């Protein structure tokens, strides 16, 4: 289902807030992932030996920022482009990595919950159910693209 103009506006409005602190929000995203599913730390080599989010870990900072920025930027472009706009190599890499790490629906759901929680905390009083629905729809579309690549 295509995003509406209103959903796109909500995504872009919240992205303006989020991109002011990508390092902080991306670390918060990972903290919420680990909080919701502690076993997920074993998917990330730089978290395997840690009981908490090591905020000064350069590998975590870099990886978290890339993931957070990729999700958010891709989400804000969905309506305009009509689909996730990743080049073929990026899409193949995303499919391959998720397949290799045996990422399944529950993992994607944990990520979605963490993403929504991070956004809600960041935008504070501007959060609404409508904004949450817009991010949920965008995230689901991005995940569907990755899952399709995982099957190939």
UniProtKB/Swiss-Prot annotation:
Its cofactor is heme b. Pfam families: Globin. Heme b binds at residues 45, 59, 63, 93, 98. It is found in: Cytoplasm; Nucleus. A motif (Homodimerization) lies at residues 35-39, 105-117. Transmembrane segments: none annotated. Root nodules. GO terms for molecular function: heme binding; metal ion binding; oxidoreductase activity; oxygen binding; oxygen carrier activity. Keywords: Cytoplasm, Heme, Iron, Metal-binding, Nitrogen fixation, Nucleus, Oxidoreductase, Oxygen transport, Transport. Residues 2-151 form the Globin domain. It comes from the Eukaryota. Its EC number is 1.7.2.-. CDD domains: class1-2_nsHbs_Lbs. It is an enzyme of class 1 (oxidoreductase). InterPro entries: Globin (IPR000971), Globin-like_sf (IPR009050), Globin/Proto (IPR012292), Leghaemoglobin-like (IPR001032), Leghaemoglobin_Fe_BS (IPR019824). Binds 1 heme group per subunit. It catalyses: Fe(III)-heme b-[protein] + nitric oxide + H2O = Fe(II)-heme b-[protein] + nitrite + 2 H(+). Phytoglobin that reduces nitrite to nitric oxide (NO) under anoxic conditions (e.g. during flooding or in waterlogged soil) and upon root nodulation. Required for general plant development and during nodulation, especially for the onset of symbiosis. Monitors nitric oxide (NO) levels during early phase of the nitrogen-fixing symbiosis and buffers oxygen in functioning nodules. May not function as an oxygen storage or transport protein. Has an unusually high affinity for O(2) through a hexacoordinate heme iron because of a very low dissociation constant. Belongs to the plant globin family. Homodimer. PANTHER family: LEGHEMOGLOBIN-RELATED, NON-SYMBIOTIC HEMOGLOBIN 2. This is Anaerobic nitrite reductase SYMA.
